[in-house]
Structures are given as structure tokens and as C-alpha cells.
Amino acid sequence: MSEINWSHDGRRITLPVRILRADNPFDLTFLDAVALVDIGATVSGIDQSIAEKLGLESLGKRPLQSAQGLGHTERYMFRIGLMPDGSDQASLPFIFDACYGFSLTGSEHFTALIGMDILRQCDFAIDRQSRCRLVFG
């Protein structure tokens, strides 16, 4: 099992991730992103700019219920990769199976969102001192 340990800022829980195309499992081309960990989200999401830079094909708009209400947003297939503690930039990330996720609208604090589709494959813990731990693999 691999793990990531970090501290959150007291307002939101974010961590670095890598976003990859889902159409070819041998294509390890990625974009770095900062992901919000959201236990209230059913599915994961990526910023529209990431989808465009990776050349992801839209799967159409679908309804999305969020804290801001009901809206319609583009859907994409993508993969999320996590770099375990102790790995260097030359290491390969742990890559989860493809997600059927949604397009985020611009946030200045994060460019991806990790929802329960990914978190249910992990052990996630947070303590009173703002330390977070994510175990996966």
C-alpha cells in the first residue's frame, strides 16, 4: 500500500494530483493539478482548461447537483494519479481506473476534485492537528 501524508490549511483539504487521458492506458501523458478532497461529491471532476489541454472529448452535458444548486456540466473520462510519499519526479504515479467525471468551473484554489468514486478505494483520515493521511493501492 502507498500513502500520502500532508496538512490542510484549515479551510479546504487539497493535494497534488496528476490528470491523465483515459482512452489509452499506455499513454502516461499527464497534467499536474491541485485537487480538492470532497467527501460530499459522488464523482470526481477536472477544470475545463485541463480537459482542453489534454484534448479530452466531451461526453455531453449532464445534470449536476452541487452546493450551488442544480446545473448542467460537461462530462469527461479521465484518470487520476497520486504520487506516494517518498517518490521523486521520475517515479510513476499510482493511477486509478478511469473516472466518468464532470467539468469544474474556475476556482482559484483547485483545478480538480476528488470525489467518492476515488475515495472509496482509499483509507482517508484527518486528525485534530490538521494532519491528513490517504492510503491507496
Language-model regions, residue ranges each:
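Pepsin/retropepsin-fold aspartyl endopeptidases
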Residues: 1-137
